[in-house]
Amino acid sequence: IVHSMAHGLSALYDTPHGVACAIILPTGLEYNKTAAGERYRAVGKAMGVTGIDEMNDVEAADATIAAVKKLSADVGIPADLKGILKEEDVQFLAESAFADACCPGNPRDTSVEEIKELYRSLM
């Protein structure tokens, strides 16, 4: 979902694609946590999250998401799309993300309405 949502942002707002992905990543991780939380342990382990092997899947996912947010902040990635994303573009962006070739690879089924809410949560 992250990559799909970032494509439209990059095109519409001339935001570098990697930056758009990084801004959206924590939101996408939260969104997919229930469908792929167990996969987050490997990411957290690679990021050096302390004690991750002793955590249950939910704790490991939360710790990994926190580590991603910290890394983003440490390298100056904005935490949201305030001042970038406009409400009048949300419908178009959500429809584009839903139709994007990357969307079917998301671990959780989604909808245009859910993607709209994800964008709005970043405003």
Q: Language-model segments: what does each one mean?
A:
Residues 1-67:
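Active-site segments that bind and position negatively charged phosphate/pyrophosphate groups
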Residues 40, 44-46, 50-123:
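C-terminal charged capping/lid subdomain of soluble metabolic enzymes
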